């Protein structure tokens, strides 16, 4: 994965069914930042790190009923992303794919 901005369409498996959203990752060297859009809201990701194709970050999601702090761990393989978001309420498998809208890396040329 090169430095740049990547947009993924993601789907999270929850006890109430699948939830769809977007994950924007901004990669610079071994650091990540960006946004997770889920439950019709956009949340910044924090403390993002990358080692090869393995990524990790944390953040907080807010639903109608509560706020959920999470730790995300996963990997990127080609155009696919696979994450596990771990919260105090359990772990949620999240998968997705690179979209064509912003999926091409932004270079500093």
What residues fall within each predicted segment?
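Central antiparallel beta-sheet cores of small beta-barrel/beta-sandwich binding domains
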Residues: 1-77, 82-109
């Amino acid at each position: 994965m090169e430095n740049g901005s990547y947009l993924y369409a993601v789907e999270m498996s929850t006890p109430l069914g699948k939830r769809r959203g977007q994950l924007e990752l901004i990669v610079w060297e071994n650091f990540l930042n960006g946004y997770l859009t889920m439950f019709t809201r956009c949340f910044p990701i924090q403390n993002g790190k990358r080692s090869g194709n393995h990524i990790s970050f944390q953040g907080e999601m807010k639903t109608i009923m509560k706020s959920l702090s999470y730790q995300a761990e996963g990997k990127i393989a080609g155009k696919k992303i696979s994450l596990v978001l771990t919260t105090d309420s359990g772990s949620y498998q999240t998968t997705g794919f690179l979209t064509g809208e912003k999926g091409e890396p932004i270079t500093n040329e």
